[in-house]
């Protein structure tokens, strides 16, 4: 199982930036459609060939599909809003999308249980195939604004697209800030462990994790309001989030779940605003590529969370929150208008 997860992770890392380039040079909408088809293919492989070769092949195509969505999704939404003069609404739209991604896990988990009882593994597999294909069909309906030629940002190859992220004024620091900030989201993998350590009964651990997820959804949904706060607010909220995370971990009581929940809500509010600030800085012709560069950084930064947890648990991860705050302050501040 670990080998399969590693294969999935490596595939996503290797495909992250190239798929962003593909979306920029071909079609962001097309990339989303292709992602849905590939993810459906992954479920087909897992359903008809549930052995090691089938699962390995499925994880490869699933990893490529996930990478296709990573940069293309945000780029398509931002440029679509910009085309109608509504780019200022992106943070609210992105926050609502992030919140929905968390909330939809609840009914899908319940439905999966019903499907398993009704038809077992195969029924769940084919239902997943149908869902992915339906998502691909829906993606064909997304509006994609026509490409506008930009004299100083021509259609660029991979190397020049990446160098854009590294050299454009104000963009490199934003990419770094979002990469490190996004990597902190790996803490969600440990919420069940934290709940057990806080004394939550084993049977109630899923409910405790659900509380944290709901708080995260609320934070993401309120990101639009957080975006209007003073410049110091984002790093301040991140520091507060880290403090609550540490306090919740050190307080060995089930009520500490509330502290972790508020921590996660604050964190996701900051993350959504940060990702929106990055989009404000990225030139349109390479938007998906640069977003994918940040996504690659997020995957790398998540390793810091895993390492910190191994060294000192949640309090050590909280230190990463504190270390990230200055990066957020520097990389995600709004440019001064003169």
Segments the model singles out, each with a brief description of its role:
Residues 141-176:
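Juxtamembrane intracellular "pre-TM" segments in multi-pass secondary transporters
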Residues 53-65, 255-262:
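Paired small-residue
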Residues 128, 132-153, 331-338:
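Helix-loop junctions on the cytosolic side of multi-pass membrane transporters
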Residues 46-48, 105-128, 196-199, 301-321:
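Transmembrane alpha-helix termini and helix-breaking/packing motifs in multi-pass membrane transporters
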Residues 119-126, 163-218:
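A single, central transmembrane helix in multi-pass transporters
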Residues 59-102:
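Cytoplasmic helix-loop-helix junction between adjacent transmembrane helices
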Residues 37-51, 239-252:
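C-terminal ends and interior cores of transmembrane alpha-helices
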Residues 13-21, 29, 198-338:
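C-terminal transmembrane bundle of multi-pass solute transporters/carriers
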């Amino acid at each position: 199982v670990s080998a399969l997860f590693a294969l999935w992770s490596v595939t996503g890392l290797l495909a992250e930036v190239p798929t962003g380039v593909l979306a920029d040079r071909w079609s962001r909408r097309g990339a989303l459609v292709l992602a849905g088809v590939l993810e459906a293919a992954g479920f087909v492989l897992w359903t008809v060939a549930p052995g090691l070769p089938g699962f390995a092949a499925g994880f490869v195509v699933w990893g490529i599909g996930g990478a296709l969505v990573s940069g293309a999704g945000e780029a398509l939404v931002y440029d679509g809003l910009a085309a109608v003069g509504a780019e200022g609404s992106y943070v609210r739209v992105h926050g609502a999308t992030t919140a929905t991604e968390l909330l939809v896990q609840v009914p899908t988990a319940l439905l999966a249980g019903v499907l398993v009882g009704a038809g077992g593994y195969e029924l769940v597999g084919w239902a997943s195939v149908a869902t992915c294909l339906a998502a691909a069909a829906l993606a064909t309906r997304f509006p994609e604004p026509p490409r506008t030629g930009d004299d100083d940002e021509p259609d660029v190859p991979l190397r020049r697209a990446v160098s854009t992220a590294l050299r454009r004024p104000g963009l490199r620091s934003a990419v770094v800030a979002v990469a490190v900030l996004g990597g902190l989201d790996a803490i969600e993998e440990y919420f069940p462990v934290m709940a057990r350590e806080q004394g939550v009964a084993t049977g109630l651990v899923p409910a405790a994790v659900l509380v944290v997820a709901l708080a995260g959804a609320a934070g993401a949904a309120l990101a639009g309001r957080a975006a209007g706060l003073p410049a110091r607010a984002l790093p301040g909220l991140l520091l507060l989030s880290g403090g609550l995370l540490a306090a919740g971990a050190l307080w060995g009581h089930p009520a500490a779940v509330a502290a972790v929940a508020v921590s996660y809500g604050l964190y996701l509010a900051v993350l959504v605003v940060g990702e929106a600030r990055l989009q404000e800085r990225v030139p349109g012709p390479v938007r998906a590529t640069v977003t994918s560069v940040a996504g690659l950084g997020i995957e790398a930064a998540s390793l810091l969370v895993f390492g910190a947890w191994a060294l000192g648990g949640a309090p050590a991860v909280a230190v990463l929150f504190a270390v990230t705050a200055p990066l957020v302050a520097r990389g995600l501040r709004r440019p001064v208008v003169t």
